[in-house]
Amino acid sequence: MANTGVTGRIPLWLIGTVVGSLAIGLLAIFFYGSYVGLGSSL
């Protein structure tokens, strides 16, 4: 637990940014698909 801010050699904030962007992107695609009518296929 000495390196709480760093996981291996990747900064924790970078992981959070990437995961957050992917989550927002997936939610946007899901809502867009539902709005267009293709949400049932996901």
From Swiss-Prot:
UniProt organism field: Stigeoclonium helveticum
Cross-referenced Pfam families: PsbJ
Residue ranges crossing the lipid bilayer per the database entry: 10-30
Main location: plastid
Recorded topology in the membrane: Single-pass membrane protein
Gene Ontology annotations of biological process type: photosynthesis
InterPro entries noted in UniProt: PSII_PsbJ (IPR002682), PSII_PsbJ_sf (IPR037267)
Protein name: Photosystem II reaction center protein J
Keywords: Chloroplast, Membrane, Photosynthesis, Photosystem II, Plastid, Reaction center, Thylakoid, Transmembrane, Transmembrane helix
The UniProt record lists the keyword Plastid: yes
Stated role: One of the components of the core complex of photosystem II (PSII). PSII is a light-driven water:plastoquinone oxidoreductase that uses light energy to abstract electrons from H(2)O, generating O(2) and a proton gradient subsequently used for ATP formation. It consists of a core antenna complex that captures photons, and an electron transfer chain that converts photonic excitation into a charge separation.
Localization, UniProt: Plastid, Chloroplast thylakoid membrane
Assembly mode: PSII is composed of 1 copy each of membrane proteins PsbA, PsbB, PsbC, PsbD, PsbE, PsbF, PsbH, PsbI, PsbJ, PsbK, PsbL, PsbM, PsbT, PsbX, PsbY, PsbZ, Psb30/Ycf12, at least 3 peripheral proteins of the oxygen-evolving complex and a large number of cofactors. It forms dimeric complexes.
Keyword check for Plastid: yes
Sequence similarity: Belongs to the PsbJ family.
Gene Ontology CC terms, in alphabetical order: chloroplast thylakoid membrane; photosystem II reaction center
